[in-house]
Amino acid sequence: AMARMGVRTGYVGKVGRDTTGDFFEQALVNLGIEPHILRGNERSGRCVSLVSADGERTMCTFLGAALEMRGDELNESLFDGYDCLYIEGYLVQDHELIGRAVRLAKACGLTVALDLASFNIVDENLGFLNELTDGYVDVLFANEQEAFSFTGERNPLEALDKISRKCPLAVVKR
């Protein structure tokens, strides 16, 4: 969406040496997004989104080559000319990678936005996510389940209040 509005956007990731990886990279180019794509030995990842009649969604993910990405593959030049690093939470379990990404982004003056991705990921990485949010995250996105896992608050407004004390901008989605 940002690229379509004329905002310079880029994507950093790792895909396989396969036709799916080629497709992903070309799709980014076609959308006006600068691809900073690394190639791994594993197959390219995929995600299937299942949506029930009442709107509940379940994401079935195979991260594939994305799991091969390492922090030492990132450098400051990847962040040159950008204003914001948006972290999609499915790779948060790689603390070294995400830690390096946020440190580099902050060193380059970027805003850091984090989408928590899944309550399961929050549950498994709560300590690390708190450290990230306290030290680096400027914008945090969470749905109600993720916000509950992150804060312990069942009421979305109370969860939003707790999150907003940790970072400048908090968003709790339904």
Where on the chain are the PLM-derived regions?
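Ribokinase/PfkB-type carbohydrate-kinase core domain
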Residues: 25-39, 51-174
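Substrate-binding N-lobe of the ribokinase-like
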Residues: 1-46
